[in-house]
Every structure is written in C-alpha cells, then in structure tokens.
Amino acid sequence: MAKQSMKAREAKRAKLVAKFAEKRAALKVLISDVNASEEERWDAVLKLQALPRDSSASRQRNRCNQTGRPHGYLRKFGLSRIKVREACMKGEIPGLRKASW
C-alpha cells in the first residue's frame, strides 16, 4: 500500500493539472505560433515557466486505484498487475482468464 500522503499528493497534482490545462494549452499554442513576434513568444515562455510545476500533466503518476502502487499499472483496468491477477483469479473481470496453451 502506498502512503496516504503519496495518494494525496497525486490527487493534488490532478487538481492542478485540471485547473491550469486551458491556460497551459493557450501558452503552448502561442509559443509554437511562427507568426507571433519573438517578444510575444518569449513572454509566453516566461508565463509558462511561472505556472506551478505540478500543473504539468507529465508530473502525474498512474497509480493503482486499490493500493496506490505506482509500478505495474495497467491502464485498461486502472489497477496494478497484482490486483488484476487477484481479480482475475476470483473471476471478477469478465472475459479475462489465465492463459493456457
């Protein structure tokens, strides 16, 4: 189990990403606009750098919904490989079964 503080930190990051998503996207469009002046683009870069570090989507870490485990995360299920295996063995995931050949 992940520490509660780690889960809380990830939740805080998710809120920040959602809060600043539009502003961050607008600044990135302005930065990549070749028709904008160099000064406008540079101002946009400075404004982007001034945003909170945790508002970047790449700072988020996928974690298991049940345990908070950061490694072995399977996006399709939102769980770690261990919890997917446990659920599979109990028959809780429809259509998923142990491989046999």
UniProtKB/Swiss-Prot annotation:
The keyword Cell wall biogenesis/degradation does not apply. GO terms for biological process: translation. InterPro entries: Ribosomal_uS14, Ribosomal_uS14_bac/plastid, Ribosomal_uS14_CS. The keyword Ribonucleoprotein applies. One of its GO terms (cellular component) is cytoplasm. PROSITE patterns: RIBOSOMAL_S14. Keywords: Ribonucleoprotein, Ribosomal protein, RNA-binding, rRNA-binding. Gene3D superfamilies: 1.10.287.1480. GO terms for molecular function: rRNA binding; structural constituent of ribosome. Binds 16S rRNA, required for the assembly of 30S particles and may also be responsible for determining the conformation of the 16S rRNA at the A site. Belongs to the universal ribosomal protein uS14 family. PANTHER family: 30S RIBOSOMAL PROTEIN S14, SMALL RIBOSOMAL SUBUNIT PROTEIN US14M. HAMAP family: Ribosomal_uS14_1. Part of the 30S ribosomal subunit. Contacts proteins S3 and S10. This is Small ribosomal subunit protein uS14. It comes from Aliivibrio fischeri (strain MJ11).
